[in-house]
Amino acid sequence: MRILLLCHRFNSLSQRFYCELSERGHEVSVELDVHPELTIEAVNLYKPDLIIAPFLKRKIPKEVWEKHLTLVVHPGPPGDRGPNALDWAILKGEKEWGVCILSAAEDYDAGDVWAHRTFPMRRARKASLYRREATEGAVEALWEALEKIERGEKRGRPQEDGVFNPKVDISLRKIDWHRDSTEEVLRKIYASDSQPGALANVEGEEYYLFNAYPEGFLKGEPGRLIARRDNAVCIGTKDGALWKAI
């Protein structure tokens, strides 16, 4: 098939899709979504059989998905909608999450489901979950969706209901050392890593925290530095401590 990859940035998932599709013999082109009018122009010039959007930050123009079958990758299970799916999953402590291939539609992540995969959630940074579990699930779901399209199926399974979760407000990422448990602090950091970071006050100075892991023995005053080792510092929490790389 003649496939157009439409993406905000040619990120790891977009690159994986490009390589996998090319190796399977598909003719693949990449268009960066920088402006709706440029997207429409690119589609009209390329005349794709299928458009796949692995990573976007805004809606696909209606003029595109009304004329061309357009599949969107959403890093959440069917029924989940919104721009910060993995962030919310980590913050809420979900035990299982997923990724699905949807048809583009008027409302965010509300299109028909062509395929989906689920995976257990690790205690890990958002970027790690995205590049491993979410990416592997997305590739598997993509092949299932393509098989259905090649069989002549015209649409996926309609979503009966869904919950839209808005962008995670910066206040929900801010660490309160005296209220948040170590687990809650880690969730905020993991959900905000690699961006935008979890805002925290450490000994009177504000920092955006990344790359943290729990300490099993040391304890100290919440928000205070209690130890240093190599390129990391240990910060006390209300019920323990954690290490933060510097």
Segments (PLM) and residue ranges:
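Short amphipathic alpha-helix with an adjacent loop that forms part of the alpha/beta core around
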Residues: 39-46
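Acyl-group handling in specialized metabolite and lipid biosynthesis
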Residues: 168-179
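A short beta-strand-loop structural module common to alpha/beta enzyme folds
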Residues: 27-38
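An anion-binding loop in the catalytic cleft
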Residues: 5-7, 19, 178-246
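Short N-terminal binding/cap micro-motifs at the start of the first secondary-structure element
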Residues: 11-16
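Structural motif
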Residues: 6-10, 32-34, 54-55
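Short, structured active-site "lid" loops
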Residues: 46-59
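Donor/substrate-binding cores of folate-linked one-carbon enzymes
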Residues: 2-4, 17, 56-164, 171
